[in-house]
């Protein structure tokens, strides 16, 4: 007796929506970026061309959201979003995708004593996440060199894998069975892509010119970021 089957199974669901907003008088998005730049020891131009500085910090420097200023005769690193005493903050992250496995299986019974089975699985993965973050001045002061900043990020990962499973059941008696199963290592080949952008309105900072500036990640990397490709292996097992 022989059995052949085809199956499509949803192994994981990544769909998620995360939204929150509120007011903050303690910290800002740009604060850790300013700390990173300050600890690097670089000038602004050197930081913009360094691989040791994160892309987000470079975007903050490019738009003058993070800058240097002379305060009480000392040159210091500043984050302009820390100037207002109160900030409106909002975060919106939308994630979609999942992992679906397509499998092909076959089973065979021999002499009512041996039962053999095998399956090939092809998991297909996709996850996509769009993130938007915004901070704005909640004080109403139009002359403190910060109106708002907005950061957006797009991340995508896709991949396909392979696995194999085989099993044997031996039934010498109706009431007695011996079984053995072999699960091959799971092999996944994945590709990731990423891009981001940041905009800041610094009000009268460059008056009479506009205080608004924006930058895409591709501007700082000389073009779209290369896709990241890698393989993921999980151990096989014998049961």
Question: What spans do the regions from the language model cover?
Answer:
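Outer-membrane beta-barrel porins/channels
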Residues: 1-239
């Amino acid at each position: 007796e022989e059995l052949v089957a085809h199956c499509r199974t949803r192994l994981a669901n990544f769909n998620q929506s995360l939204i929150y907003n509120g007011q903050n008088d303690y910290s800002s998005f740009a604060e850790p970026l300013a700390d990173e730049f300050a600890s690097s020891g670089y000038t602004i131009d050197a930081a913009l061309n360094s691989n040791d500085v994160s892309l987000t910090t470079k975007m903050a420097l490019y738009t003058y959201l993070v800058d240097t200023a002379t305060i009480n005769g000392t040159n210091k690193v500043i984050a302009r979003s820390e100037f207002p005493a109160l900030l409106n903050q909002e975060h919106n992250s939308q994630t979609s995708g999942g992992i679906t496995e397509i499998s092909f299986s076959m089973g065979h019974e021999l002499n009512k004593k041996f039962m053999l089975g095998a399956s090939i699985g092809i998991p297909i993965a996709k996850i996509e996440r769009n993130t938007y973050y915004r901070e704005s001045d909640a004080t109403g002061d139009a002359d403190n060199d910060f109106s708002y900043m907005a950061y957006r990020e797009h991340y995508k990962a896709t991949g396909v894998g392979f696995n194999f499973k085989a099993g044997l059941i031996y039934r010498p008696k109706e009431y007695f069975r011996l079984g053995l199963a072999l699960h091959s290592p799971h092999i996944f080949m994945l590709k990731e892509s990423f891009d981001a952008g940041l905009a800041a309105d610094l009000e009268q900072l460059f008056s009479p010119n506009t205080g608004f500036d924006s930058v895409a990640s591709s501007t700082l990397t000389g073009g779209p970021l290369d896709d990241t490709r890698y393989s993921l292996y999980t151990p096989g097992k014998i049961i």
